[in-house]
Amino acid sequence: MKLVFLGTSAAQPTENRGLSCICLEREGEVLMFDAGEAAQISYMKSGLGWNKKMKIFVTHLHGDHCVGILGLLQTMSMQNRTESLEIFGPSGIEEFIAANIKVLNFGLSFPILINTIKDEKIFEDEKFLIRTCKANHSIIAFSYLFEEKDKPGRFNVEKAKELGIPEGELWNKLQNGNEITVNEKIIKPEQVLGERRPGKKIGISGDTMPTKELEEFFEECDYLVFDSTFLEAEKQKAQDTCHSTAKQAATVAKNAKVKNLVLTHFSARYRDEVEHLREAKEIHDSVITAKDLLEIEIK
């Protein structure tokens, strides 16, 4: 599983930064959070693949977070995508996409399903779930939390051999949590598996001011990607525009007992993120500043 940053600039692109777009790739599936203008260019550079199982989660309907969906859909069609795609977002997301497809008069080579956020839990399958929390921004906006479900413990090869279990399909069944029968004896998964491994938690703030609700929402995340548009010197500007400073992001992470903080969404006024990193590290020990095409392996 890995995080891939496709765009890390706020409001407008720079020579080195595209607009907001973050991907979480796991087991051949891509979960994309926001898609600012030209997201398809960074996506192409990432090598993530055009026909993978995919879901797009939009935090809010400001152009630097959603306009890139249109180009992404068109490019995927030109690449002959056939896999269906789901899109989740705030009220208005369906009208936004449908109107643009109609006006631009382009067809898609694959089906899309658009979901308007109405509940806290918006997606769940046997391996993970996605929850939302209202962010504090200038328009309706949501933060997202990816929660991986606990995984089976590590498979003990030596124990399996001692029990006379032939390698292959029966090993796979045990690893998937199923009982098997060997020589008329029932063997339970716990006989060959270690303790269950806790799943990972990854938070994506989108554009927001810091709030106590978000601190609770992101509690004990393994990684938290948080709005860091400004430095402390522009704290008033952050408040006026409903964004956060790097130091405020670090404070949220510290209070939420987050293991690793990733700063992103930097204002184009800054040439680099040296000061963002310095200010955040005054509060939290483990801080990364995101760059376009940065990949973070999550183990």
From Swiss-Prot:
Q: Where is the active site?
A: 64 (proton acceptor)
| The reaction(s) this protein catalyses | Endonucleolytic cleavage of RNA, removing extra 3' nucleotides from tRNA precursor, generating 3' termini of tRNAs. A 3'-hydroxy group is left at the tRNA terminus and a 5'-phosphoryl group is left at the trailer molecule
Q: Which residues bind Zn(2+) 1?
A: 60, 62, 137, 207
Gene Ontology terms for molecular function: 3'-tRNA processing endoribonuclease activity; zinc ion binding
Keywords assigned: Endonuclease, Hydrolase, Metal-binding, Nuclease, tRNA processing, Zinc
Keyword Aminoacyl-tRNA synthetase applies: no
- Amino acids binding Zn(2+) 2: 64-65, 207, 265
Q: InterPro entries under this entry?
A: Metallo-B-lactamas, RibonucZ/Hydroxyglut_hydro, RNase_Z/BN
What this protein needs as a cofactor is: Zn(2+)
What top-level class of enzyme does the UniProt entry assign? hydrolase
Q: Which PANTHER family match?
A: ZINC PHOSPHODIESTERASE ELAC PROTEIN 1
- Protein family membership: Belongs to the RNase Z family.
Q: What does this protein's UniProt record list under function?
A: Zinc phosphodiesterase, which displays some tRNA 3'-processing endonuclease activity. Probably involved in tRNA maturation, by removing a 3'-trailer from precursor tRNA.
> Which NCBIfam families does UniProt cross-reference here?
PRK00055.1-3 (NF000801), RNase_Z (TIGR02651)
Q: How does it assemble?
A: Homodimer.
HAMAP family this protein is in? RNase_Z_BN
Q: Identify this protein by name.
A: Ribonuclease Z
What is the protein's species of origin? Answer: Nitrosopumilus maritimus (strain SCM1)
